[in-house]
């Protein structure tokens, strides 16, 4: 997980790795 400093990116990454 890259630290972009944006919560939206972090959330997007989690939703990508985790099943819907």
Curated annotation (Swiss-Prot):
A GO biological-process term: defense response to fungus
Region (Disordered): 1-20
Compositional bias segments (type: Basic and acidic residues): 1-13
Entry keyword tRNA-binding: no
Domain of life: Eukaryota
Keywords for the protein's UniProt record, in alphabetical order: Antimicrobial, Fungicide
Function description: Has antifungal activity against B.cinerea, M.arachidicola and P.piricola. Inhibits HIV-1 reverse transcriptase.
Protein name, entry field: Cicerarin
């Amino acid at each position: 997980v890259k630290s972009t400093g944006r919560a939206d990116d972090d959330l997007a990454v989690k939703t990508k790795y985790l099943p819907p």
